[in-house]
Amino acid sequence: MMKVLVVVALLVTLISYSSGEGIDDLEADELLSLMANEQTRKECIPKHHECTSNKHGCCRGNFFKYKCQCTTVVTQDGEQTERCFCGTPPHHKAAELVVGFGKKIFG
């Protein structure tokens, strides 16, 4: 439902912008690149995939949105870099465990 609202908002914005005076300044290539940027923003990063460059783009899990968890990695050269992945934080894992256990007991 949220995706539909975002697409509708984008279309309303484009239509209102086209009725204004600024549409003549926009070329077709610029409009296509704007729509491509919107599409890539909607795509989310699955669990256990790298999110170093997009720390707020993780997908939703069963109950919660995955969080971007980062660690510092030291290479053989001694250089430190930050690597991040989408995962479930420990407190979310505990909540999912309790809910799963409750479903087994109460059906």
UniProtKB/Swiss-Prot annotation:
The lineage of its organism: Eukaryota, Metazoa, Ecdysozoa, Arthropoda, Chelicerata. The keyword Glycoprotein does not apply. Disulfide bonds join C44-C59, C51-C68, C58-C86, C70-C84. PROSITE patterns: SPIDER_CSTX. This is U1-lycotoxin-Ls1b. Residues 1-20 form the signal peptide. It comes from Lycosa singoriensis. GO terms for cellular component: extracellular region. Residues 21-41 form a propeptide. InterPro entries: Spider_toxin_CSTX_knottin, Spider_toxin_CSTX_Knottin_CS.
